[in-house]
Amino acid sequence: MCSSDLVAPDTGVWLLSPARVVEAFIHALELPAAAWGTNRVVNLPGITATVREMVEAMGRVAGPEAVQRVRWKPDARIEAIVRTWPVRFATPRAQQMGFRADPDVESMIRDYIADENIKPGRR
């Protein structure tokens, strides 16, 4: 199975893994009301990575055969949309409240492989 990447390799995106999102929901539920003050909106911490950095991290974790499945086929329409998304957020309030980001893309990939019980060579 191949995956087509619809944006250019240098496209940056803000990332938070599904595991950290679920963790954030649970953490938010467990916070006392006073921790929120009058504003109950918070941007969650995350990391910024380019699509190239994500693919390179996948190669370091899953091997070159995983990278070989990626086909760079940028779609101008999709890229125009994605490039309007913010690439970085300042999240000091969220961090002070105890929310956390993934440390790096490799950790996100390793967690996904473990959570999905993916075995080497499985496609």
Where on the chain are the PLM-derived regions?
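Mid/C-terminal beta-alpha module of Rossmann-like enzyme folds, strongest
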Residues: 11, 16, 20-82, 119-122
